[in-house]
C-alpha cells in the first residue's frame, strides 16, 4: 500500500455497542503492526505504523540465517541454507538444511521446531538465506507452501534460488498469497560462496 501510518482517535465517551456510534473496520489486521497509544485532549489516539523500516532488524536475522547455513554438510543434491523464525510475541526458532533429516529444508526444520513448541506462527517473519522453494520431490509440501499454510506475514532472504535443480517461483507464490517478501541482495554473495560446492561463487 500507499499508506505508511494510520492514526485513529476514539472518544472514550462512546459506548461499545452503541447502535448510533460510527463504525470503523480497519482494512488490515491491527495485531500485525507496531502501534502507539496516547491521550490527546480527551481522545484515545492509536497510531499504527503499517510499513516500519525494518532494514536493521532484517539484516540482523538474515546474517544469523546465513551463519546457520554453514552448519549444513555440503551435498551434491542440496543447497546449504539457514532459517530463523521470529514470532509476533518475539519467540525465535532456527533451522538449517538436513539438520534432523536428509530430506528437510531449513525453513521446514525451523517450522517443525516452532510447531512442536506450540508457537503461534500467524503473522510471524521467517528469514532464510535463500528463497524458499516452490517445488519438492522429497516432501509433500514446498517451503513456500508451508509458509503460506502457517500464516506467516513476512519472508526475508538474500539470494533468489539459482536454477541448479528447478526453476523456483517461491517469492512469486508468497507474494500472490499475501506474504510480504523482502530481498537483500547485498548479502547474496556470501550465500553463493557457502554453496560453492554446487558451482556457485561470490
Predicted region positions:
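Short, basic and Ser/Thr-rich N-terminal targeting/leader segments
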Residues: 77-81, 104
Amino acid at each position: 500500500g500507499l499508506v505508511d501510518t494510520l492514526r485513529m482517535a476514539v472518544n472514550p465517551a462512546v459506548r461499545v455497542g452503541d447502535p448510533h456510534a460510527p463504525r470503523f473496520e480497519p482494512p488490515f489486521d491491527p495485531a500485525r503492526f507496531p502501534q502507539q497509544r496516547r491521550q490527546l485532549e480527551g481522545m484515545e489516539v492509536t497510531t499504527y505504523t503499517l510499513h516500519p523500516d525494518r532494514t536493521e532488524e532484517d539484516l540482523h536475522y538474515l546474517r544469523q540465517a546465513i551463519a546457520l547455513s554453514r552448519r549444513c554438510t555440503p551435498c551434491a543434491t542440496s543447497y546449504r541454507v539457514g532459517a530463523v523464525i521470529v514470532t509476533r510475541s518475539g519467540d525465535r526458532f532456527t533451522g538449517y538444511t538436513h539438520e534432523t533429516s536428509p530430506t528437510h529444508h531449513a525453513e521446514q526444520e525451523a517450522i517443525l521446531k516452532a510447531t512442536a513448541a506450540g508457537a503461534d506462527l500467524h503473522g510471524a517473519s521467517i528469514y532464510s538465506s535463500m528463497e524458499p522453494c516452490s517445488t519438492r520431490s522429497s516432501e509433500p509440501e514446498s517451503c513456500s507452501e508451508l509458509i503460506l499454510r502457517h500464516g506467516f506475514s513476512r519472508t526475508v532472504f538474500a539470494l533468489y534460488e539459482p536454477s541448479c535443480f528447478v526453476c523456483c517461483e517461491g517469492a512469486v507464490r508468497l507474494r500472490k498469497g499475501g506474504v510480504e517478501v523482502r530481498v537483500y541482495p547485498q548479502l547474496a554473495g556470501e550465500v553463493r560462496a557457502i554453496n560453492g560446492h554446487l558451482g556457485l561463487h561470490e
